[in-house]
C-alpha cells in the first residue's frame, strides 16, 4: 500500500527520520505494492525555523506514543485477521540510493521508531492467527467439481447421459402444465420399447445353402440388368434432347421438331368452322373440301290476319283465352259478356254492354 520516506536534500541518500517525521507501512506496502501520492508541504518556512531550533536545542525527551494502529486484512469481503500495531518509523541500516517511492509526510508529529524486523515478526504473527478462508473456499470448490465428475462417470457407465453427453436434469413437475405432466407420467409408466441388441462375439456366420446362393445370384443379375436399362434410357434421353435442340435451331420452330419426330413432315392443321354474328346477320363458314350441311328449314310465317276477340261486335285482337269456354278474348268486359252468352244470364245478346 504505502511507504512514507523522507527525500534526501542534496546527496540523494536515505537519512534517518528525525523526531517529528513519520513513516507508516501497511500490509500491502510490506510486500511492495501500491504507492501513495506525494503530499503537499505545509508551513514550509515555519518548519525550517523549527528544524533549526531543534538542532540548536539538542536532543530532547521523546513525546508520549500515539495510539496504536489497527491492521485489518480483508479478502473477498471476509476479514482474515486483525492486529494492533503501534505507529513507528523505519530505521535504515545505511545509506541507500534514492528511490522513486519517497513521499514526504507531515513532519510535525513525532513518532517512535520500530525496527523493520519487528514489524515483519508482527505480520508473521497475524498470518498465524487465523487461517485464510480462501483455502476452504478453494477446497470446497474442488470437492464439488470432483463430486460432479464422479456423478458424470457413474451416469456414463449406466448410460443415463442425454444426447449432448450431459447429465440429465431433474424435471420439476410443478412447473409443467397438466398435459406435459400427463405425458411425462405416461412415458415413465410405459417400458422402453428399445431393447439392447445381443452382441455375438466370435459366432461363425450361418452356412449358406445352394438355394440361398442361387437367390443371391438372381438378385445380383437383376440389379445389373436394371443398371444397364437405366444407363440406356439416360443415353436415349440425352440423344433425343440434343436432336431436338439441333432441329429447333435448324428449322426455326417447334412445329418442325414435332413434325420430324412424327415422320419427317409437319402435320396439316385441323379443319375449323367459323361462326360470326353481327348486325347484318350471322354467318357460318366452312373450310374448302368440307361439305356444308343441308339448309335449315325456315319456319313458315303465319298467314292471314291475327285472330280477334270472339265476342260479337268486338274489333280488338285476341289477347288471351277464356279459362272456362276457351274463347278468344281481349278484356275483362268481353270476358263477362262471353260468360253471359255461353253460360246464360239475366242479360242476353241485346245487352247494352255490347254497344260499349
Curated annotation (Swiss-Prot):
Cellular localization per UniProt: Nucleus; Nucleus, Nucleolus
Residues the record lists as Phosphoserine modifications: 97, 99, 127, 130, 132
GO MF term set: zinc ion binding
Domain of life: Eukaryota
ZnF HIT-type span: 305-336
Compositional bias annotation for Basic residues: 33-51
UniProt region (Disordered), positions on chain: 1-71, 124-150, 246-269, 286-310
Coiled-coil annotated residue ranges, if any: 213-245
GO CC entries: Ino80 complex; nuclear body; nucleolus; nucleoplasm
Keywords: Coiled coil, DNA damage, DNA recombination, DNA repair, Metal-binding, Nucleus, Phosphoprotein, Transcription, Transcription regulation, Zinc, Zinc-finger
UniProt GO BP: chromatin remodeling; DNA recombination; DNA repair; positive regulation of DNA repair; positive regulation of DNA-templated transcription; positive regulation of telomere maintenance in response to DNA damage; regulation of cell cycle; regulation of chromosome organization
Function: Induces growth and cell cycle arrests at the G1 phase of the cell cycle.
Self-association and partners: Component of the chromatin remodeling INO80 complex; specifically part of a complex module associated with the helicase ATP-binding and the helicase C-terminal domain of INO80. Interacts with RP9.
Protein name: INO80 complex subunit B
Species assigned in the record: Homo sapiens
Gene (name only): INO80B
Amino acid at each position: 500500500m504505502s511507504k512514507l520516506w523522507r527525500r534526501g536534500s542534496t546527496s540523494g541518500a536515505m537519512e534517518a527520520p528525525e523526531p517529528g517525521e513519520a513513516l507508516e507501512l501497511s500490509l500491502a506496502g510490506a510486500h511492495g505494492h501500491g504507492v501513495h501520492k506525494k503530499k503537499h508541504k505545509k508551513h514550509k518556512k515555519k518548519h525550517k525555523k523549527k528544524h533549526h531550533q531543534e538542532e540548536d536545542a539538542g536532543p530532547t525527551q521523546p513525546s508520549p506514543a500515539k495510539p496504536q494502529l489497527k491492521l485489518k486484512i480483508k479478502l473477498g469481503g471476509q476479514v482474515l485477521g486483525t492486529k494492533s500495531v503501534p505507529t513507528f518509523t523505519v530505521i535504515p541500516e545505511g545509506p541507500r540510493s534514492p528511490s522513486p517511492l519517497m513521499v514526504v509526510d507531515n513532519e510535525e508529529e513525532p513518532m517512535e521508531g520500530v525496527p523493520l524486523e519487528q514489524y515483519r515478526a508482527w505480520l508473521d504473527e497475524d498470518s498465524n492467527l487465523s487461517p485464510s478462508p480462501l483455502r476452504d473456499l478453494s477446497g470446497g470448490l474442488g470437492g464439488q467439481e470432483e463430486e460432479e465428475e464422479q456423478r458424470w462417470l457413474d451416469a456414463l457407465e449406466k448410460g443415463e447421459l442425454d444426447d449432448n453427453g450431459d447429465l440429465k436434469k431433474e424435471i420439476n413437475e410443478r412447473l409443467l402444465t397438466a398435459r406435459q405432466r400427463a405425458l411425462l407420467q405416461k412415458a415413465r409408466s410405459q417400458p422402453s420399447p428399445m431393447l439392447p441388441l445381443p452382441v455375438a462375439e466370435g459366432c461363425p456366420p450361418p452356412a449358406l445353402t445352394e438355394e440361398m446362393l442361387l437367390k443371391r445370384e438372381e438378385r445380383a443379375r437383376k440389379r445389373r440388368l436394371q443398371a444397364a436399362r437405366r444407363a440406356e434410357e439416360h443415353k436415349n434421353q440425352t440423344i433425343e434432347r440434343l436432336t431436338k435442340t439441333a432441329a429447333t435451331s435448324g428449322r426455326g420452330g417447334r412445329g418442325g421438331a414435332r413434325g420430324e419426330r412424327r415422320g419427317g413432315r409437319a402435320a396439316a392443321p385441323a379443319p375449323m368452322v367459323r361462326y360470326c354474328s353481327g348486325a347484318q346477320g350471322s354467318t357460318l363458314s366452312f373450310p374448302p373440301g368440307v361439305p356444308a350441311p343441308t339448309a335449315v328449314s325456315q319456319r313458315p310465317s303465319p298467314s292471314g290476319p291475327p285472330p280477334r276477340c270472339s265476342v260479337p261486335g268486338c274489333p280488338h285482337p285476341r289477347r288471351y283465352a277464356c279459362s272456362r269456354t276457351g274463347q278468344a278474348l281481349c278484356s275483362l268486359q268481353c270476358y263477362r259478356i262471353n260468360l253471359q252468352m255461353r253460360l246464360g244470364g239475366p242479360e242476353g245478346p241485346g245487352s247494352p254492354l255490347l254497344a260499349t
